[in-house]
A protein has these predicted regions:
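Long C-terminal interaction/binding lobes of large macromolecular proteins
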Residues: 1-6, 17, 123-195
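Short, conserved DNA-binding cores of transcription-related domains
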Residues: 1-70
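Intrinsically disordered, low-complexity regions enriched in Ser/Pro/Gly/Gln/His and often acidic
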Residues: 25, 105-106, 169
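Residue-level marker of intrinsically disordered, low-complexity segments enriched
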Residues: 37-38, 80, 103, 164
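Short, positively charged, Gly/Tyr-enriched micro-motifs
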Residues: 61-145
């Protein structure tokens, strides 16, 4: 799976052979159809239907899905909804029943998101801080402040990356949720293998 903040640009890169294979690193990905259609719940109750592009490596023959970073692998809800739940819990102390009611999803779903993010919070924060350092190299950007919880610190680091990409790298505020996914939430939300 390749996460892409800009699905149209990623499709163009796939068509031109500009994407390197993440499996072998030697080959280039070429278009190889589409993945299965997914219905994703968005914040506010709307849904989106998407059949993500698939690429196949010319060297190792591995296939990879190009997943827009506003989605998370094997999750029915968009990163924006999951991020809102994580912020409400980690930074405001809101309970899962209330978060679920506000988002229109079962409390058990919210508990699953939060459980996965809490387990991976340290790694997510570490990765986000490395990216933050790259995005802000040579710039006067403040480091994210500690929040008092591992998940809160991870969310602050991911948000700092998204803010840095908007401030220093020409992204726009419309890219906020895809950037949150790209800088950690989509990847670290993936369910554990075999679950």
């Amino acid at each position: 799976m390749l996460l892409c903040a800009d699905a149209d640009a990623a499709s163009a890169d796939l068509a031109s052979g500009a994407l390197a294979c993440p499996s072998c690193g030697a080959g280039r990905l070429r278009p190889w159809g589409r993945g299965r259609e997914r219905v994703i719940r968005l914040r506010g109750g709307a849904t989106a239907r998407l059949s993500p592009r698939r690429g196949r490596c010319g060297s190792c023959r591995a296939t990879h899905i190009l997943l827009p970073s506003w989605m998370a692998s094997r999750r029915a809800d968009a990163v924006g909804a999951i991020a809102a739940a994580a912020v409400a819990s980690a930074l405001h102390g809101t309970g899962t029943a209330r978060i679920g009611a506000d988002l229109g999803v079962p409390a058990a779903t919210v508990r699953g998101w939060l459980r996965r993010l809490r387990v991976r919070a340290g790694a997510m924060r570490q990765d986000a801080m490395v990216v933050f350092g790259r995005l802000t190299a040579g710039c006067d950007a403040p480091f994210p402040e500690p929040s008092g919880s591992a998940l809160g610190d991870a969310l602050s680091a991911v948000a700092a990356c998204a803010h840095a990409a908007i401030t220093f790298c020409g992204r726009t505020a419309a890219d906020w949720e895809p950037l949150l996914g790209l800088f950690g939430l989509a990847r670290f939300l993936a369910p554990a293998p075999g679950s």
